Amino acid sequence: MLKTILVGATGYTGAELAHYITKHPELELAGLYVSEHSLDAGKPFSSLYGHLLGVVDQTIQPLALSNIKHICDDVDIVVLATAHEVSHDIAAEFLAQGTVVFDLSGAFRVNDPAFYEKYYGFKHNFDKELKSAVYGLAEWASADIAEANLIAVPGCYPTASLSALKPLAQHGLIAAEQKPIINAVSGVSGAGRKASLASAFCEVSHAPYGVFNHRHQPEISTHLGHEVIFTPHLGSFKRGILATINVKLVAGVTPEQVTAAYQEAYQDQPMVRLLPRRTPSIKAVEKTAYYDLAWQQQGQDLIVVSAIDNLLKGAAAQAMQCINIRFGFAMTTSLV
């Protein structure tokens, strides 16, 4: 059994991770941690998430930087479901103790220190760790994930977008002079568990945000190798992402070429479901680890639609896929 600790355990993604780790036949949940000043420290985990009563009842523990060496005794895996700056500050400490780190923040997703000053507002001080980090888009980086000790789990919007676009880019099907246009709507859980007026029940309304300045746009462009236009929307539902992507294809690309690109990429990927000429929906992926993908073509115009659960395939489930890849377990272990 691989001893696994979870830092940032009390957020929505943390709760999903705690459940996945507990269900995994090869992992042992060895600790649930929050910041040392968190009001949740000392509480039973199931007092926050009642559906996990009798499943995850461990006491939530405070994490102090001075205790990292001590708590890493015999620990194999550290999962960070923490804020970007927190992951930036503590990932190297855990790596130094010989653990394998899976980070769900944005702190190590792009191997360029300047990226963080420009888009995240902090100076990145860990060049060695940043250079060694692998971007954990599970279906696209399995060989690198299997060898890495720091895996940066992609964001929810990038997962929904990149998985739709990378097969096209890989085969050179996207017109070079056109930027794919991504419109994606996410459930309110994407805003996190912290109270906010904008996500309050009586206030939330379907609306765009972060127009031209959302930090996931450069993350998508960087890992696609092609500039995109990305507009996120906040939806008035709890969980899930539905992305509609408009792509201008290279002249002469046939529907058969598009279908072949997607089939080649995903025919052996159990967590991706191809739905040609059908319509993905949030209902079909909610509370699952699946990625649903469909497309329709008219001449040079291609519309691609993808759906995921933002907390699962967009976060916790993809982290678990990366754990499975890294340690040689079946891809679907604990997920289905």
From Swiss-Prot:
Gene Ontology terms: cellular component: cytoplasm
Primary localization class, coarse: cytoplasm
Location(s), subcellular: Cytoplasm
Keyword terms, alphabetized: Amino-acid biosynthesis, Arginine biosynthesis, Cytoplasm, NADP, Oxidoreductase
List of catalytic residues: C156
EC number of the protein: 1.2.1.38
Pathway given in the UniProt record: Amino-acid biosynthesis; L-arginine biosynthesis; N(2)-acetyl-L-ornithine from L-glutamate: step 3/4
Top-level taxon: Bacteria
Substrates-to-products reaction catalysed: N-acetyl-L-glutamate 5-semialdehyde + phosphate + NADP(+) = N-acetyl-L-glutamyl 5-phosphate + NADPH + H(+)
Any one Gene Ontology BP term: L-arginine biosynthetic process
Keyword Disulfide bond listed: no
Alphabetical list of SUPFAM superfamilies matching this protein: Glyceraldehyde-3-phosphate dehydrogenase-like, C-terminal domain, NAD(P)-binding Rossmann-fold domains
GO MF terms, alphabetically ordered: N-acetyl-gamma-glutamyl-phosphate reductase activity; NAD binding; NADP+ binding
A Pfam cross-reference name: Semialdhyde_dh
Alphabetized InterPro entries for the sequence: AGPR_AS, AGPR_type-1, NAD(P)-bd_dom_sf, NAGSA_dehydrogenase, Semialdehyde_DH_NAD-bd
HAMAP family on file: ArgC_type1 (MF_00150)
Protein task: Catalyzes the NADPH-dependent reduction of N-acetyl-5-glutamyl phosphate to yield N-acetyl-L-glutamate 5-semialdehyde.
Family: Belongs to the NAGSA dehydrogenase family. Type 1 subfamily.
Entries under PANTHER family matching the protein: N-ACETYL-GAMMA-GLUTAMYL-PHOSPHATE REDUCTASE, CHLOROPLASTIC-RELATED, N-ACETYL-GAMMA-GLUTAMYL-PHOSPHATE REDUCTASE, CHLOROPLASTIC-RELATED-RELATED
Protein known as: N-acetyl-gamma-glutamyl-phosphate reductase
